[in-house]
Amino acid sequence: MADNARAKRLADLIREVVAQKLQRGIKDPRLGSQVTITDTRVTGDLREATVFYTVYGDDEERAAAAAGLESAKGVLRSAVGAAAGVKFTPTLTFVADALPDTAKTIEDLLDKARASDAKVREVSAGAQFAGDADPYRKPESDDESDTAAKTDGDAAE
């Protein structure tokens, strides 16, 4: 079993080789400039590699890019094998990265929360407390502070 540093180096190499090959080496129109390799993970035995990608476009373009990656899997694996120089070239599995969709969902939720906060701020702009500003805090009188100072002074002696 390989160490984690070697698996990370191989994952980085696979990401770079696949990205370069997609840009320059593969003539499939489904794999145009809209496909981006976001991450690569390699198993501990260096036999399986999962390549995460994003596609900028609608669902049809995503499906076309997935089909294009599946058809180019052998060419990409050969390029990785030539560049890596390992005994066994990892089997490539392409997975659409859910990160952009998740980020968009989070951004939508944050925008909704900001709008709700702004609405609450508008409503409470001229509002006042129902009672005193802080009903649990009692003003300290001079008599109490003098007696506290005397008891502190008595304790010091």
UniProtKB/Swiss-Prot annotation:
Basic and acidic residues composition bias: residue spans: 147-157
One GO-annotated biological process of the protein: maturation of SSU-rRNA
Main location group: cytoplasm
GO molecular function: ribosomal small subunit binding
Entries under Gene3D superfamilies matching the protein: 3.30.300.20
Localization in the cell: Cytoplasm
Transmembrane residue ranges: none
UniProt keyword terms in alphabetical order: Cytoplasm, Ribosome biogenesis
GO cellular component: cytosol
Origin superkingdom: Bacteria
Region listing for Disordered, in residue ranges: 124-157
Record's keyword annotation contains DNA repair: no
Function: One of several proteins that assist in the late maturation steps of the functional core of the 30S ribosomal subunit. Associates with free 30S ribosomal subunits (but not with 30S subunits that are part of 70S ribosomes or polysomes). Required for efficient processing of 16S rRNA. May interact with the 5'-terminal helix region of 16S rRNA.
Family stated for the protein in its record: Belongs to the RbfA family.
NCBIfam families per record: rbfA
Complexes and interactors: Monomer. Binds 30S ribosomal subunits, but not 50S ribosomal subunits or 70S ribosomes.
Name of the protein: Ribosome-binding factor A
Species this protein is from: Streptomyces avermitilis (strain ATCC 31267 / DSM 46492 / JCM 5070 / NBRC 14893 / NCIMB 12804 / NRRL 8165 / MA-4680)
